[in-house]
Amino acid sequence: MSNILRRGRLEAAPDEEILRYASSMETDRWIFSADIAVDLAHTVMLKEQGIISAEDCSKILAGLLKIREEGMEKLDFSYEDIHISLESRLIDMVGEDVGGRMHSGRSRNDEVATCIRLTLREELLGLLEEIFALRKTLVSLAEKHTETLMPGFTHLQHAQPTTLAHHLCAHEAALGRDFDRVQDAFSRVNLCPLGAAAFASTGFNLNRKRTQELLGFEGLLENSMDAVSSRDFLIECASVFSNLMINLSRMAEELVIWSSSEFNFIELDDTYASTSSIMPQKKNPDTAELMRGKTGVAVGALMSLLTICKGLPLSYNRDLQEATPNIWRSVETVRASVRVMEGMVRTMKIHPEVLSAQSVTGFTTATELADTFVREAGIPFRTAHQIVGMLAREGEKPTIEKIDSVAEIVLGESLSSRGLTEKMIKEALNPVSNIKRRKIEGGPAPEEMQHYIGRQQTELELNEQEIATIKDSIDSAFEALLEVVDEYRKV
């Protein structure tokens, strides 16, 4: 059978190399189900608008359901994309006089834009669920470790004591913003371009609101030229994915470092480790290392999308075909990474005794000692900073005598003469006292962390409800679509 797309305008068929070069069929596997759904909704609307007969509608719907049942492998991969291949298969089944009417009032331009949005919408919903699961795991783990001391770091140097709960919740907070960004992107993805046709809409009396409703979209992309030519939603999602992967990469880096012999803060479960082909004692954190590497997939996809979309005149250009594979690669990598990270965190073995012992290494209580000088001796913080810095340089344990000696050099008087006592110094140098004192909002004090964790658990419950509401809305729309398809098919 001749190519239903080329036979009118073009005489020569493309050779095999051009077919391979121009074809998107392999990538279009991502949108097979979406394309069937779009065809079903469009056909229903055509019938309701009186553009096709009830009998033709019935045959087209039956054919589409059969194609869905057969799967994509039954399609002809010699076509340049899934849309023409699917339509060709339909025409083979029901004849051109019937199947050839399905594309009335429609272009591949609005069709593919709708398919991409439908598929990406599902991927974003799945990603929201996966980020939610990771955040929930982090919060649950933090709840068990509000009093587990550990060193906090700046520049990867021991800085101040904190708790494991405080550290875990820092990652959860970043992931919470990632969750919000995915939600925001979802709101702009969940818009329907169908009915825009090539770019100038159509003279057929289409009901765009009806197909929007049947496909469960929140609203329309109203301007028909914008509807088919915009891929800013892909760029936005790729940016969100890149940000998320960078946050995951930071977590992965910490897991690599923390599981090393030098740190020994944690041990990864064997599931997430590998060994050496020559060194039998090795337990390598390969999964976490791969996650660092796979961050490049997401960042690279963003760069590709920006480069492809730059400088394209309105409206549709074939360059956009090269944009779509990047988003599928990115979202596939990101979703897998979130799932894997959740598993690594949930199953890792924590060494609280090592964390606690390391919490005071490197004079981590120095800041609290300086703060104590300010509070108890009434000196300026910058002066206290100088005194403690000199003590740190000498490397000796701060005692009241040593502190007074340095203070005499800096101030010309002792701090004990200004009310500082040995008891105050001991309390300042105690990491537990350090943590308990830091009870302002967002601090690591156990009491404050318990309040924070409670607030995060409430937020997670709300997030779970939000996801369920969106899914229910989309599921209801597709149930309604299938019900009307079943009704019209029986005519």
UniProtKB/Swiss-Prot annotation:
What SUPFAM superfamilies does the record point to? Answer: L-aspartase-like
Keyword Amino-acid biosynthesis in annotation: yes
Q: Which residues form a coiled coil?
A: none
Its Gene Ontology molecular function terms? argininosuccinate lyase activity
Under which pathway is this protein filed? Amino-acid biosynthesis; L-arginine biosynthesis; L-arginine from L-ornithine and carbamoyl phosphate: step 3/3
Which locations, inside or outside the cell, does it occupy?
A: Cytoplasm
Q: One Pfam family, short name please?
A: Lyase_1
Q: Can you cite an annotated GO cellular component?
A: cytosol
- Which keywords does the record carry? Amino-acid biosynthesis, Arginine biosynthesis, Cytoplasm, Lyase
Name the EC number(s).
Answer: 4.3.2.1
A GO biological-process term: arginine biosynthetic process via ornithine
Does this UniProt record's set of keywords contain Transferase?
Answer: no
**Catalyzed reactions per annotation:** 2-(N(omega)-L-arginino)succinate = fumarate + L-arginine
What domain of life? Archaea
| Family, similarity comment | Belongs to the lyase 1 family. Argininosuccinate lyase subfamily.
PANTHER family according to UniProt: ARGININOSUCCINATE LYASE
Q: What is this protein called?
A: Argininosuccinate lyase
What species was this sequence derived from?
Answer: Methanosarcina acetivorans (strain ATCC 35395 / DSM 2834 / JCM 12185 / C2A)
Organism placement in taxonomy: Archaea, Methanobacteriati, Methanobacteriota, Stenosarchaea group, Methanomicrobia
